A protein has these predicted regions:
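A transmembrane helix-and-boundary motif of multi-pass membrane transporters/channels
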Residues: 1-220, 224, 228, 235
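Soluble C-terminal extramembrane regulatory/interaction domains of multi-pass membrane proteins
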Residues: 183, 187, 243-270
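Acidic, serine/threonine- and proline-rich low-complexity regulatory regions
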Residues: 226-241, 261
Length: 270
């Protein structure tokens, strides 16, 4: 029985993940063809690496748009730092190594940021390193690597946007439905507080409450992606704010009822 269940889960494919996997292969094919026909140096390996970095990190159009801006900025900053390094200190090994270490430390610090600026760090560090540690680097190397990396980002962006696009607004609808479902389950837990198993009910209640709060956080993230997809022209802003407000009010009402159920009745004074 367990083997049959495991086999069923193994062959049950997620449609969105399957579509995105096919899109990743298509984007890689475009990169290979572009590199072959235009005779890019190193067989266009940095075009292909950039495509894989972008496609394997996100699947939704809104998320890829949002992060691609930051990745482009990262390549610009990395190319500028590399140019200054080649101009000012190269081929001095000590100074070049020092700049690489300090810049990598700064890019790593940015990459660990909780904001969207985190995407600047990895591509900035990669761009700097692949330019400076190349064999006999020059300003031609700077331009070549900069264009190759950004070409990979553009190819990934176009494939994501125009070939079987996976929109954030669709995912947002699903998350809204799941949130309402979890709110319903949370409300059902109130019945358990009237029984003697209140301790067990508390754990179950906290689980559903955490799910609701997690879904609300995902909604905010997806809404930002939806606005990116429409370049800020969507009229969903006020609608989403109203939905978010109502969800919080429902959660607040359920919590008030739970607290009331947990409060022992006061003994009246004689």
């Amino acid at each position: 029985m367990r083997f049959a269940k495991w086999r069923f889960q193994l062959f049950r494919l997620d449609n969105d993940r399957l579509v995105h996997s096919l899109k990743t292969a298509i984007a890689l094919l475009f990169g290979l063809l572009f590199s072959y026909f235009f005779k890019l140096p190193l067989q266009g390996q940095w075009v292909l690496i950039s495509i894989l970095v972008v496609m394997c990190a996100q699947s939704r159009v809104g998320a890829i748009l949002q992060k691609s801006y930051m990745r482009f900025l990262g390549t610009v900053i990395g190319a500028i730092v590399a140019s200054l390094t080649l101009w000012l200190v190269y081929p001095n090994v000590v100074y070049t190594t020092l700049i690489l270490c300090v810049a990598t430390m700064l890019f790593s610090y940015i990459a660990d940021s909780p904001s969207t600026w985190s995407e600047v760090g990895p591509l900035g560090a990669v761009t700097l390193v692949v330019i400076v540690v190349a064999q006999n680097p020059s300003f031609n190397t700077v331009m070549s690597r900069f264009l190759e990396i950004n070409l990979g980002i553009v190819i990934a962006l176009l494939v994501s946007r125009f070939i079987w696009p996976l929109h954030s607004r669709t995912q947002l609808r699903y998350i809204l439905i799941h949130t309402l479902h979890e709110l319903k389950n949370l409300a059902k837990q109130l019945e358990a507080f009237t029984s003697v198993k209140a301790d067990k009910a508390d754990k179950s209640y906290e689980l559903f409450e955490d799910n609701v709060l997690n879904y609300i956080g995902i909604q905010k993230k997806l809404f930002d992606e939806v606005m990116r997809e429409t370049f800020g022209r969507s009229n969903l802003g006020q609608i989403f704010q109203n939905i978010l407000y109502e969800e919080r009010e429902i959660l607040r009402g359920i919590n008030l009822m739970k607290n009331a159920a947990n409060t022992p009745p006061k003994v009246g004074a004689n």
